[in-house]
Amino acid sequence: MFTQAAKPLLVLHALTAMALLGATTHLVVVKTLRWRGRPRERLEQMYSRLIAPLFVGAFFLGLTMYPHFRVDVRARNLDANQPWASNLFDFKVHLAAIGVPLALGLFFLGRRGPAARPVTDLFAVTLWLIVAWSVVSGLIITSVRGV
C-alpha cells in the first residue's frame, strides 16, 4: 500500500512544506514590519493561525510515508551508500519535531495580542529557521534518493 501511495504522498508533503515555508516567511516579514513601526495586525494573526494546520499537515504526511521510506529507501540505499543523507534526515526529523509545539504555540498565543508578542516573535523566527532548514534538507535528501 505504501509503495503505490509513496510518490503522491511525497508530492503532497513537499507542496504542504512549501506552503508552510511561504506562511512562515510572510509571518516573519509582517513581524519585521511591526518592529519597524508599520504593524499589520490582521496579517500577523492570519499567518499565525495558518501555520499550525500546515505544519501539522506536513508533519502527518511525513509520518504517513515514514514506514515506506524506512524500509524501501533508507535501509536499502541511504544507510549503506549515503550515510550522510540518513544523518541529515534524522536531524531534519528531530528539528521538525521541535517545531510542533512552536507552531501550536503560535496558533494559540497569536490571538493574545501585545502581551504575547515577545514569545510569538521568538516562536515565529525560530519556526521559520526550522521550516527553511527542513525544506532545503528534504529537497537534498530527495535528490539523493526519493521514494
Feature annotation, model-predicted:
Residues 1-147:
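Polytopic transmembrane helical bundles with strong interfacial aromatic enrichment
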